[in-house]
Amino acid sequence: MVTAIVAILVLVVLFAVIVAIAKDPGPQPEDVAVAYEVAWDKLDFESLYTLAGSELRDGLDRHQFIVAKKAAYAEQRALSGLADRVGVDDSATAGNAAIVATRVELHDGGVVCNRVDLARRNGRWEVVGYRLAPTDAGGPPPGS
């Protein structure tokens, strides 16, 4: 009798854990966009590949992508570690699409604003577009 009760309790707990995991939405578009910016700042090509959709992987598999990016940036180490702070200025989500306007504050006092386009695929957000956004002189970033 006690064994049956313990077995039922274990099954109930297991079911509750599975439901909780299934309902977890994972990182939100804003989190993924900030992680993508930070990965670029660190020239962390492994993370960039993981966060990017096929649109930004240059048709390469993971290994090829990382090797190609490391080769392309081998002499550009000065481009890493420039960000002092990365944040989100604005975001909009509609269904399985999102646009996030990021703001990268640089150590030298400069600011770079980017537009990060994301798509929700297989239960997770992927970066599918990434471009420089207009700054103060050009008006608000697209999608804001």
List the predicted regions and their residue ranges:
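Exposed beta-sheet edge and beta->alpha loop/turn motif
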Residues: V86-S144
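Extracytoplasmic/periplasmic, Sec-exported soluble proteins
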Residues: P25-Q28, E37-D41, R57-D61, A92, ...
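Short, low-complexity N-terminal intrinsically disordered segments enriched in polar/charged residues
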Residues: M1-K42
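A short, amphipathic edge element
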Residues: A68-A97
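Hydrophobic pocket/interface hotspot
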Residues: Y36, L48, F65, L118
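Short, well-ordered alpha-helical segments enriched in acidic and aromatic residues
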Residues: L43-D58
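Short, charge-rich amphipathic alpha-helical segments embedded
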Residues: D58-A71
